[in-house]
Amino acid sequence: MKLRLGLVGVGGAWENRHRPALRALSDRFEVRAICEPVARRAEIAARDFSCDTVDGFRALAAREDVDAVIVLSGQWFGALPILAACDAGKAVYCAAALDFDPDQAREIRDRIEKSGVAFMAEFPRRQAPATLRLKELIATRLGAPRLMFCHQRVPAEARKGPATGDAVSRTHDLVELVDWCRYVAGYEPTSVLGLTHVKEGEPKEIDYEMMSLDFSGETPGTKITAQISSGRYMPACWPEAVSFRPPAALQVACEDGVAFIDLPSTLIWFDHAGRHMESLETERPVGEQMLSHFYRSVTSLVRSTGGLEDAYRAMRIVQQAHRSHAEGCRIKLDFS
């Protein structure tokens, strides 16, 4: 059985992730229509997959020959393509940046739940070969995590005006990092402490964000602590500085060892026996793994919305981290 797809946008990961994955999984997916505001990109993608171009995402979601909607780029649409797919009863795969206020995030979650459609948010760090192998090692060799350090360094583009798209991208990056730590920890955090640094000058832009997640119960600091940071303080015109001694994407100190991940497929870990290095280049690309998972969730008789709750909780944590910075205190987390 092939799933007939409607694509909303092509997004920044189109050439390297989504297009190759859809090509490789042509036995499971068939692209029937594309909605992309930039006409030239729409024409190229439509020609590539021999499909139609559609003027609006609502018309795309309403098509009878579309079984699922793949949102690859939010652009100015925001959550509207997701809601349109829910109204049309179509499954949703969301790779667009997730940046909604608390009320809107709650509304989107409720609308998806009421619609009864399958939903999956794209979190590629979860499905990276190195992450999956780390979960195996935690269960078999390294023991339970105690401390996690998750860092991201992104080149900052020079801008003269408001950078709304950058703000959405920055928030989405944090949402994905938070979800990654939740997944590796295997628990929900109970509190968050956030800190934001704003670059001087006009326009004012955030160039560094940090948060500390505590996974303990009543007594803080007694279980798992995760430190997450995302920096955009190095100009893109300094490529050598950006790539100089980059920190490990994720460092996990466990009961019986420590592990370092460099995405997508390099894992170095240490235990009492010494150093172990694993290169997992032979694993299936992340894009194929995620779309295969989406295919199974849509064709299964059991409805899957696990990604929905994961996305909602990660968004809530980032929002509460921003609140923590504004109020200057640690915030207890409530996901109701």
Identify the residue ranges that each predicted region occupies.
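C-terminal helix-rich "cap/oligomerization" subdomain common to oxidoreductases
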Residues: 7, 68-71, 216, 296-336
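Active-site loop of classical SDR/Rossmann-like NAD(P)-dependent oxidoreductases
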Residues: 13, 280-292
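Beta-loop-alpha module in the N-terminal Rossmann-like domain of NAD(P)-dependent dehydrogenases
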Residues: 49-111
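A short helix->loop->beta-strand "cap" motif at the edges of active sites that frequently abuts
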Residues: 51, 88-90, 115-117, 220-224
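Hydrophobic residues in well-ordered beta-strands that form the structural core
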Residues: 55, 94, 119-121, 261
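A contiguous active-site-proximal alpha/beta segment in oxidoreductase catalytic domains
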Residues: 99-161
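Contiguous beta-strand/loop segments that form the cofactor/metal-binding neighborhood of enzyme cores
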Residues: 172, 176-265, 289-300
